[in-house]
Amino acid sequence: MKLRGVSLAAGWFLLALSLWGQPAEAAACYGCSPGSKCDCSGVKGEKGERGFPGLEGHPGLPGFPGPEGPPGPRGQKGDDGIRGPPGPKGIRGPPGLPGFPGTPGLPGMPGHDGAPGPQGIPGCNGTKGERGFPGSPGFPGLEGPPGPPGIPGMKGEPGSIIMSSLPGPKGNPGYPGPPGIQGPAGPTGLPGPIGPPGPPGLMGPPGPPGLPGPKGNMGLNFQGPKGEKGEQGLQGPPGPPGQISEQKRPIDVEFQKGDQGLPGDRGPPGPPGIRGPPGPPGGMKGEKGEQGEPGKRGKPGKDGENGQPGIPGLPGDPGYPGEPGRDGEKGQKGDIGSTGPPGLVIPRPGTGVTVGEKGNMGLPGLPGEKGERGFPGIQGPPGLPGPPGTAVMGPPGPPGFPGERGQKGDEGPPGISIPGFPGLDGQPGAPGLRGPPGPPGPHISPSDEICETGPPGPPGSPGDRGLQGEQGVKGDKGDTCFNCIGTGVSGPRGQPGLPGLPGPPGSLGFPGQKGEKGHAGLTGPKGLTGIPGAPGPPGFPGSKGEPGDVLTFPGMKGDKGELGYPGAPGLPGLPGTPGQDGLPGLPGPKGEPGGIAFKGERGPPGNPGLPGLPGNRGPMGPVGFGPPGPVGEKGIQGVAGNPGQPGIPGPKGDPGQTITQPGKPGLPGNPGRHGEVGLPGDPGLPGPPGLPGIPGNKGEPGIPGIGLPGPPGPKGFPGIQGPPGAPGTPGRIGLEGPSGPPGFPGPKGEPGLGLPGPPGPPGLPGFKGTLGPKGDRGFPGPPGLPGRTGLDGLPGPKGDVGPKGQPGPMGPPGLPGIGVQGPPGPPGIPGPVGEPGLHGIPGEKGDPGPPGFDVLGPPGERGSPGIPGAPGPMGPPGTPGLPGKAGASGFPGAKGEMGMMGPPGPPGPLGIPGRSGVPGLKGDNGLQGQPGPPGPEGEKGGKGEPGLPGPPGPVDPDLLGSKGEKGDPGLPGIPGVSGPKGYQGLPGDPGQPGLSGQPGLPGPSGPKGNPGLPGKPGLTGPPGLKGSIGDMGFPGPQGVKGSPGPPGVPGQPGSPGLPGQKGEKGDPGVSGIGLPGLPGPKGEAGLPGYPGNPGIKGSMGDTGLPGLPGTPGAKGQPGLPGFPGTPGLPGPKGINGPPGNPGLPGEPGPVGGGGRPGPPGPPGEKGNPGQDGIPGPAGQKGEPGQPGFGIPGPPGLPGLSGQKGDGGLPGIPGNPGLPGPKGEPGFQGFPGVQGPPGPPGSPGPALEGPKGNPGPQGPPGRPGPTGFQGLPGPEGPRGLPGNGGIKGERGNPGQPGQPGLPGLKGDQGPPGIQGNPGRPGLNGMKGDPGLPGVPGFPGMKGPSGVPGSAGPEGDPGLVGPPGPPGLPGPSGQSIIIKGDVGPPGIPGQPGLKGLPGLPGPQGLPGPIGPPGDPGRNGLPGFDGAGGRKGDPGLPGQPGTRGLDGPPGPDGMQGPPGPPGTSSIAHGFLITRHSQTTDAPQCPHGTVQIYEGFSLLYVQGNKRAHGQDLGTAGSCLRRFSTMPFMFCNINNVCNFASRNDYSYWLSTPEPMPMSMEPLKGQSIQPFISRCAVCEAPAVVIAVHSQTIQIPHCPHGWDSLWIGYSFMMHTSAGAEGSGQALASPGSCLEEFRSAPFIECHGRGTCNYYANSYSFWLATVDVSDMFSKPQSETLKAGDLRTRISRCQVCMKRT
């Protein structure tokens, strides 16, 4: 079977083979001849058809890389790529070039007056200057007021008992006194010894009594019985003046003083006294005003640095009570208390209690309660004066309580003096004041040794006050005392003498002049209480008394005490109630749009960026598709919703404190525990804005949502405020976050062109300068541009007296007028002296006017000083005057940057005159003025007694107010020091108050929200703590001038300061319009500069001192002023023609270049004065010009130093000379004569020479003329409180002051209980005049009373008829002894002007006058004959150093020197810097001197100064971020107080990631260390300029290798460099930032504007080809930096 299958298969095969092989055979056997049988077995067939492709094979192994192909052709420019995301912010570029100066800004409005600055540090005492020359004697000043009484002299030795009977020297006759009132008859004296009989005379009528003689000697010690009181005699006529007789004192005769006579009738009232002291303050003080409206929103303050939030401290324990404070100032007068109960009636012992007539006005009781305020009544006419009441002595009433001190009452009209009956006699009073010496008595012959005592004359008026005597010398010691029991035993009182006969009445004499107050007499025994007199006028306020006894009357309010000394610090207070919210800040600017953020890996914490400002919320968009996107930004605060329903009542709170009476808020209690969280109520009303939280940290980026972002929707409208969320639990205390880094400091900018700042506070008064020269009268110039606000000018001259004006009420300020101010008119005729006006009420403060045109009028001629008139009262404010003269130049200010001039502003109104300033120092004597018109003849009055207070001035009913209503809110106070920056809150509507929670700890800061809507201005918050001084801001606008403050207490004069050193000359300031300054000292001669144009001819100056005789030059006459021409366009400079009329200022042309000096032109005539041009901006300070050419003249003989003459007008620079070679110095010639002025030269270039050296101190000048009285200066700042002085003597009454402000209302005291009888109170207020009383019965004749004091001066009596002639008296012998010098007489009238005197003798030659104008160039003279040899001159100044001479010939060979020392003694110092924190080792062969820190360079005042790193100066032994300070010429140094820098080599220490500045100890790892080494030989650095290390020269050894460091710059593109031969140019390590910048505020950091410069590699083949630009990145930096090696010469 198997075999069958095989054969069958073979058969099938053969069949197929046969079928297939037929065509093959045919093909194989092709070519066989037909009929022949071909054998085709085994022949290869033809190529078959291509098969189907096979399956893909497996990839083969990678082949080897082929060779690099050639570079392909440059491809086409590709399409623009899609815009990439914004790159990071680039580093700050270098500062750009300074821009062109901007156009001048308009002048700003005047700024507010700044608050007085703090008191400066007292300067050092200056060195004592040399004694100056004595000045000329000044004119006598006005007579000053009498000085205070001197210190009592030392007690003299006891006087000797002189038993001599010789009379003293006779005094000069005094002035006759006025007639006195006849006194009562004196007691009859003892009969004298019988004199020799006189010649019989006829009996004459009794003569009038004589004037009182000098005090008689003591009477004999006999006492008689007291006689009855005599009737008052009629007034006797004045007696004729007698002559002083020589009186011999009886030996051992003692006189007893008699009883005092009866008091005289009360005289008529005296003349009104001087104006009394200022009355009490006006109306009652109103109640406290309501809270003022909140002020406008202020400008945003500067950002302060964020402080780290501190944890609130616990309240401290109460401290110990402080020391008692100083006495407080006297408080304001309290309200008058209620009336007390009547006092007890204490009957007088020994007398019955009979009710007498109504007594005088009792002491004022306690005031009643305050009534309602009535309307002010119309002032009634003064009532008629009532007659004096009867003086029946009633029993004294009970003493009342001491009343408060009453206010000063109005002075009543003088009463009609109806004399009453005489009262009862009082006890003898105290001895009166000692009267002046009387006139001389009649002569008595010397034979009459004892004179009878005549009847006493009437008391004389007080005499004139004598001059202040000098303190007497200590007297001689007295003889031994015979009666030494104390002060002597008084003898018994003598009997009163018999009453004398009444004299006939004399005629009334003329009234005498009022006498001066006499000296105080000795204190007598205290008399009994006299009859109560009529109420006297109120006295002057007394000085402050000693503290009185404490009266324990309840309810009495004491006066406010003096200001106490500051007490010790009190206990720390408990926390106060929270303050009110501050004002919201301004909204910040809009921030930059952010990029599309894709979620990245969380990176390292970045530097804290500045917080971005939130953008506005966009409008609502359509709903996007896809999953929700990230949380959107917070929208703008929506409109407040309607109030919700009241919430569910919360849990019951802790019981509140029961307050029975509304009091002040109590101390806050301890915080309660947290209650359970209640259910959230419905939303309440929006609450007040809370304090802002601390910004939270930025959250993690959220996971990005899946889905395509939708298109941004439109901005939605503000949503309605949602309900508040549930309250969270209190968070834990957060960790203290790191403080953010300060920003990079910007480069120091160019000086800004700022507007002038507001005027500073008034400077200290300067020293009195010398008088400047008198200027010419100029023509009025066009209005100049307004200059800077000047310092307060010196007081202007006193104006003429205006016409008598009626005092009108102050009108409202008028609107400012518009118009150019014309030149001042001629002075008006002086008007009559005005009547005293009322004190005007200060007007409302006017708005500040815009600045006016500063047109300067021509200066007037100096007037003659008039005779000083009596000071008039203060008149009403006059109309604004014309602008005064410009003030004298102030001291030079600090050097300021030049501001641009602004266009003139419109004129503003004049301000209100300020108060009187502190009197200035007495000026030097002025020159003799022209004689003024004769003034009215005034009589010199002696100093009068302080008069009684005058009647009150007329009161305007509009001004006299009763108690005012509650006042308006006060002006805002002085702004406090700006506090720390507050956060900006969102103002909301006020909500219902919540319960006070426990203060939470600061939570984590959230993301910054959008700016809220601006809230209402909050109430003014409490002043913050004083912040650190911020950067100087731009000058603010000048504020409104505040009301004048109260005058400060004058401080004690300070000790004189040391004179400062002379400062450098500043840049020229803007040419202001002012008086010429004081002439400066003569400087050293500078190089001859280019001459300027000739100036204006000056008017005739004051006569100078005689100069050396010269040939007078031709002086041109001043021409008449021409008419101004129209402004011309700037044309090319023509030939100098004759001077034309001054044209109006033309348009400014372009600045031309400096021309070459032209040849001197012919001398022209002096032109008319041109008009003042507008001052241009100051040019840049030029380089010093080339020395002018010209042959120097021979130096003159040195003159003696004369007195400084009056300053001449400024000289005009002369024409330029031709350039000539420098001549040899000639012999000293004599001074040349003054030549005529030269012609105007071409203008020189506007270059400014260099600063000259300070000249020597010039001799003092002559005293200038006395200036006029200046206007009062501004009120100075209030001085420091002085120490409490000792209690002074009672001063004279002051001038009436203006009505004071109403005081604060005091509390009403409760009525007091009835107290014990008090001591007598103060005098009560003057009562209304009573009705005339009925005359009483005549009283019984009482015992003899003591004589009353002299009544007031009576009215002048009529001149009586002359009496009959008296009989001739006995002829006496005149013994004339010269008396003492009498008091000075009344000054006589000024005499007539005397005739001119004869010419005086020839005066001494005057000092050399000022140099004259330069003369025109003369023709060259012929050679003169050789003069004789002069005397040897004074030694000249040392000459400048000469040029080096040629080398001299070779010297002879010297002897061999001594053996040399070891070469190591000649060490060379080098410095090696490690650039690490470890100090380096000194190289082999050198010795270390010291270690230190590597200082690279410093920068101060924008200028850098570098150190050579190879020298020891670059290795400071101590490190400081500010190792230097700066000093100025004023002996003041400042340290770490400016924007200065220091730069130090640094280490490879990496900066922290935050890049915040390094402070404190964290700076140390960044500062490189260094070592100073001593090498035995010279050390140099060699540089290869390749990357190979160079070899040391032959014979030199290597010390170290490094990189070639060349230069470095940083802030402000300042820096320094290294000498390439110095070892400092070869740093051992290369770093792109090899140094670090440190500042005076104690920080260091790396900054992007710091660059280091390294020597680069140079290929030999590229030495002279263009360098190819190349940028090297990190890693390749060292491939282009040259290498170097430091080598030391072998020794």
Swiss-Prot record:
Limits of the Collagen IV NC1 domain: 1467-1691
Region ranges (Disordered): 49-548, 566-1465
Record cross-link S-Lysyl-methionine sulfilimine (Met-Lys) (interchain with K-1673), residues: M1555
Biased composition (Pro residues): 62-73, 193-212, 266-281, 434-443, 683-692, 868-880, 1139-1148, 1234-1243, 1359-1368, 1398-1413
Sites where a glycan is attached: N125
Biased composition (Basic and acidic residues): 246-257, 285-305, 324-333
Biased composition (Gly residues): 1202-1211
PROSITE patterns according to UniProt: NC1_IV
UniProt keywords, alphabetically: Alport syndrome, Basement membrane, Cell adhesion, Collagen, Disulfide bond, Extracellular matrix, Glycoprotein, Hydroxylation, Repeat, Secreted, Signal
Region of interest: Triple-helical region: 42-1462
Cross-link (S-Lysyl-methionine sulfilimine (Lys-Met) (interchain with M-1555)): K1673
GO cellular component: basement membrane; collagen trimer; collagen-containing extracellular matrix; extracellular space
Segment forming the signal sequence: 1-26
InterPro entries xrefs: Collagen, Collagen_IV_NC, Collagen_IV_NC_sf, Collagen_superfamily, CTDL_fold
Any one GO BP annotation for this protein: cell adhesion
Ranges of Low complexity composition bias in the record: 52-61, 133-142, 413-433, 786-797, 882-901, 983-999, 1007-1028, 1103-1120, 1224-1233, 1301-1311
Annotated Pfam families: C4, Collagen
Molecular-function GO term, any one: extracellular matrix structural constituent conferring tensile strength
Family named by the database record: Belongs to the type IV collagen family.
PANTHER family for this protein: COL_CUTICLE_N DOMAIN-CONTAINING PROTEIN-RELATED, COLLAGEN ALPHA
Protein function: Type IV collagen is the major structural component of glomerular basement membranes (GBM), forming a 'chicken-wire' meshwork together with laminins, proteoglycans and entactin/nidogen.
Disease with which this protein is associated in UniProt: A defect in COL4A5 has been found to be the cause of canine X-linked hereditary nephritis (HN), a disease similar to that in humans (also referred to as Alport syndrome) characterized by progressive renal failure and neurosensory deafness.
Free-text note regarding domains: Alpha chains of type IV collagen have a non-collagenous domain (NC1) at their C-terminus, frequent interruptions of the G-X-Y repeats in the long central triple-helical domain (which may cause flexibility in the triple helix), and a short N-terminal triple-helical 7S domain.
Self-association state and partner proteins as the record states: There are six type IV collagen isoforms, alpha 1(IV)-alpha 6(IV), each of which can form a triple helix structure with 2 other chains to generate type IV collagen network.
Name of this protein: Collagen alpha-5(IV) chain
Organism of derivation: Canis lupus familiaris
Name of the gene this protein is made from: COL4A5
